């Protein structure tokens, strides 16, 4: 099985990379589970004081939820969301700062995940987009609350 989340630890920080570049790092249920577990593991590691969160490749930080996977699930979004660990909750529980290294686009749930970070660093190609209404998904990770506080 391919590692959907890559983790590197060194010098007090943990680098977490979403690793589905061909799918624009779309957040499949398995990727969300692996990401939440990786963040929880770093919270338990006393040596890790900072997390850097990024996406593999240069096209996308993450395009948000995997819409192909959601379309194949009976019950759609809510059933899919309940079945998985919540990476945004795990990010919120981390005691140190989280740096979002946003390479490429952060769309819908990816935009929400970026807003769960304490500091965002972008590239000239970084773009943020909220397409929740277009795809019929509610912003359940706090976009409407966090965005207005920027």
Task: Report residues per predicted region.
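Glycine- (often His-adjacent) and acidic-residue-rich active-site loop
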Residues: 55-93, 134-136
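CoA-thioester-processing core
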Residues: 87-93, 101, 107-150
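Conserved phosphate-binding and hydrolysis motifs of nucleotide-dependent enzymes
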Residues: 19, 25, 64, 104, ...
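Hydrophobic/aromatic residues within transmembrane alpha-helices
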Residues: 16, 53, 66, 113-115
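Acidic-histidine catalytic/liganding microenvironments
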Residues: 45, 94-95
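Conserved CoA-thioester-binding segment of acyl-CoA-metabolizing enzymes
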Residues: 1-54
